[in-house]
Regions:
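A SIS-like phosphosugar-recognition module
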Residues: 1-182
Length: 182
């Protein structure tokens, strides 16, 4: 399994695309690396536990944005005593950067970790990231000996779905599935 992880919330939908790209392109003929994503720091505590002490079946790729554009300062809340006062006045960028460094160090002691770094998230850098992953997917599929451009596994469920929903041309399969499902 490969986990693509980042501390950048703007990458949420990018993760979905990345998972689809690699799962659909490599996941055939009993080949491929199962792609998953980690949206840190949100999932760091739960997923981090598995990464630190669970089965060693994962390698991790960090997509690190050196200069995130968003900025927010932690302000004191006099109503709640939660032992997080030491964070008052700190920018979330500083907190995320420290958490990234701590996470990379801890995880790299347990599993292979790689870092892909971009300066900022701009339309140009997004283009670079998309191109990088599309090209690496193409190359890795070639190494695995699979065609990254077909999707036979997807076709199986689509045919069943078409039959069950009554799409013309799928009548025989619909009858076969009806007998199996009841």
């Amino acid at each position: 399994m490969e986990m693509l992880a980042s501390f950048e919330p703007q990458l949420h939908w990018f993760y979905k695309w990345w998972i689809q790209l690699f799962a659909e392109s490599e996941g055939k003929e009993d080949q491929g690396v199962y792609p998953i994503s980690g949206e840190y720091s949100e999932e760091l505590h739960s997923v981090g536990q598995f990464l630190q002490d669970g089965s060693p079946v994962i390698f991790e790729t960090f997509l690190h944005v050196k200069d995130p554009q968003a900025s927010m300062i932690v302000h004191p809340d006099g109503c709640v005593k939660d032992d997080f006062d030491y964070l008052n006045g700190k920018d979330f960028r500083e907190i995320n950067e420290a958490t990234y460094g701590a996470t990379l160090r801890a995880h790299s002691e347990k599993m292979p970790c790689m870092v892909l770094e971009v300066e900022k998230l701009t339309p140009y850098s997004f283009g670079e990231i998309f191109y990088f992953f599309m090209y690496t997917c193409y190359v890795s599929a070639g190494i695995l000996g699979v065609n990254p451009f077909d999707q036979p596994g997807v076709e199986a469920y689509k045919k069943n779905m078409f039959a069950l929903l009554g799409k013309p041309g799928y009548e025989a399969l619909r009858q076969e599935l009806a007998e199996k499902l009841h």
